[in-house]
Amino acid sequence: MPNDPLLQPYQLKHLTLRNRIIVTAHEPAYPEDGMPKERYRAYTVERARGGVAMTMTAGSAAVSKDSPPVFNNLLAYRDEIVPWIREMTDAVHEEGAVIMIQLTHLGRRTRWDKGDWLPVVAPSHHREAAHRAFPKKIEDWDIDRIIKDFADAAERMKAGGMDGVELEAYGHLIDQFASPLTNELDGPYGGSLDNRMRFCFDVLKAIRARVGDEFILGVRYTADECLPGGTDKAEGLEISKRLKESGLIDYLNIIRGHIDTDPGLTDVIPIQGMANSPHLDFAGEIRAATNFPTFHAAKIPDVATARHAIASGKVDMVGMTRAHMTDPHIVRKIIEKREEDIRPCVGANYCLDRIYQGGAAYCIHNAATGRELTMPHSIAKAHCRRKVVVVGTGPAGLEAARVAGERGHEVIVFEAASDPGGQVRLTAQSPRRREMISIIDWRMSQCEKLGVTFHFNTWAEAEAIQAESPDVVIIATGGLPHTEVLSRGNELVVSAWDIISGDAKPGTNVLIFDDAGDHAALQAAEFLATAGARVEIMTPDRSFAPEVMAMNLVPYMRCLQKLDVTFTVTYRLEAVEKSGNELVAHVGSDYGGISKQRTFDQVVVNHGTIPLDELYFELKPFSSNLGEIAHDQMIAGEPQSVVRNAEGKFQLFRIGDAVAARNTHAAIYDALRLLKDI
């Protein structure tokens, strides 16, 4: 048996799990027509191939038609899901992993205007703030129907080859019954804890009657809502004991907190700048009190924390879910004693925030995740060695250098600054975003292992690039802040970058005009307000900081509201002029009919970046493709074959913000899909 606690097998009823690491249930929003088709299967199988003991799919699969798929959920109520499930389970089993699926009825945690436009049901009329739907108070015939739906869905999953099912209780219908905050029913399903737990046990009994004993059944539930009047720790312990004593389930999966609001969700699933494993000790208390198999996941991003979770006996199986979105091969690298090669999860939460905004989940710095059908997690060697010159060491340039190095090419990188990182190094200046620098550090480490040559403090000139006789040139020079957005007074403003970097001294009465909606404006506001300034953030948008997204916004708002920062939406800064020692801001609105003046001593503009593209255009006439990228080939993940200049000596590509202001993920994706076939 291995000495590493993480690599020790675990016996869960009739199943032997090959190690202690699991990918807990989550919904990456990859279903097509409610089915786990090729894309979803490829994503799931990659984690099994990487060595996890168990992967749980769906977060969660809907059991009823009145549980609309607001997260693009799998539709477990449809019979046609069975063959798709069978293809997935067979493929996962071939890789040696166990696979389960999570089932749910969302209750009020959805919307009536999704799916079949059926009323949302819950044990009270109280809406969930996050999804805003006012529910119908559930009736007796609804309860009977939904219990049967759970059993039918579990039977389908067993027919599809699943090793078990997990009930998603927390925040969903089962926990809405269990919590005194959300259950206002009379009769057998409301009031006392016995009655509030009745729905959960009726569902479990119905499922167990259908699937038999040789099938794993677990519950992921809230053992402490951390809300006045809600399920508290004492009641959570009692619920845990009752679940064990029922004899109906095989493990507990512990959650602490509530997810009905963005702040609540962010405390349950912490992001960067928040503490690692904040609920691990609590899960350990549940395990100690019940002496029953216990699973847990909540910001356990690294092997050391996971190892502690198992070695200390706090849990039996440790979930590293977001970590496996970043690197699906964590277990393989542990076994091969290559922990330093594990791509680190930086807690940026790009994955979850995209889901909650209605998109598919992507990792901020692994562009292959969710694109396994076209993008590789392991880079294959090229058939012939080429010389690749990269200009810039932001995320795009470093990813290009890393991938080219993995291909076996000679790689030379030029960087004008003394340190790598570009905008990522800048954003990591803020304590809450310090983890972002790992995006850069990991790539630098990988590049050094691959023999990439770096020239820092070197301004790359076109002649110097051509003197290298490259086969491929990658321009990843990024951009500079775009502040030329006013009708007059552009010379009087500073950029958000100036504030974050410390290049501009903070004012005392500051307007931040945020026309980009990304992190920079909020970071600048936090820096200024912490320094004692009175700060107002103004945006012409009707919503605030849309590019930051919901969960990432929470820590900012908690800080900025306490510092009395003012937030103004739907107003546009049009011009700035100097008046003595003050600045007069001329403010209008896209909605028209507004013109007013405000006085500040500093104005900050956040309006994205302008590409640093002079070098690209200097080199373009000498390239074989004249800088052109074949979009169809790029989208399909195929090699670039454009030749527009037969006399050209090299292929030329520009990527990241050297093309246009986008984000870190887009920059890394540019690099991966262009360089993987070079």
Swiss-Prot record:
Binding site for [4Fe-4S] cluster: 345, 351, 363
Signal peptide: none
Named cofactor requirement(s): FMN; FAD; [4Fe-4S] cluster
Positions of FAD binding: 396, 415, 423, 433, 460
EC assignment: 1.3.1.-
Cofactor binding note of this UniProt entry: Binds 1 [4Fe-4S] cluster per monomer via a modified motif.
Binding site for FMN: 59, 102, 220, 299, 321-322
Pfam family, any one: Oxidored_FMN
Annotated metabolic or biological route of this protein: Amine and polyamine degradation; stachydrine degradation
Reported induction: By stachydrine.
GO biological process: fatty acid beta-oxidation, unsaturated, even number, reductase/isomerase pathway; L-proline betaine catabolic process
Gene Ontology molecular function: 2,4-dienoyl-CoA reductase (NADPH) activity; FMN binding
Keywords on record: FAD, Flavoprotein, FMN, Iron, Iron-sulfur, Metal-binding, NAD, Oxidoreductase, Plasmid
Cystine connections: none
Consequence of gene disruption: Loss of growth on stachydrine and its degradation product N-methylproline; still grows on proline. Proline uptake is reduced by 41%. Stachydrine (an osmoprotectant) no longer protects cells against growth inhibition by 500 mM NaCl. Stachydrine uptake is normal, but its metabolism to ethanol-insoluble compounds after 18 hours is seriously impaired. Colonizes Moapa 69 M.sativa plants as well as wild-type but is slightly impaired in competition with wild-type bacteria.
UniProt catalytic activity: N-methyl-L-proline + NAD(+) + H2O = L-proline + formaldehyde + NADH + H(+)
Family label: In the N-terminal section; belongs to the NADH:flavin oxidoreductase/NADH oxidase family.
PANTHER family given in the database record: 2,4-DIENOYL-COA REDUCTASE (PTHR42917), 2,4-DIENOYL-COA REDUCTASE [(2E)-ENOYL-COA-PRODUCING] (PTHR42917:SF2)
Role noted for this protein: Possible NADH-dependent oxidase, may function as a demethylase that converts N-methylproline to proline.
Stated name of the protein: Probable N-methylproline demethylase
Gene that encodes it: stcD
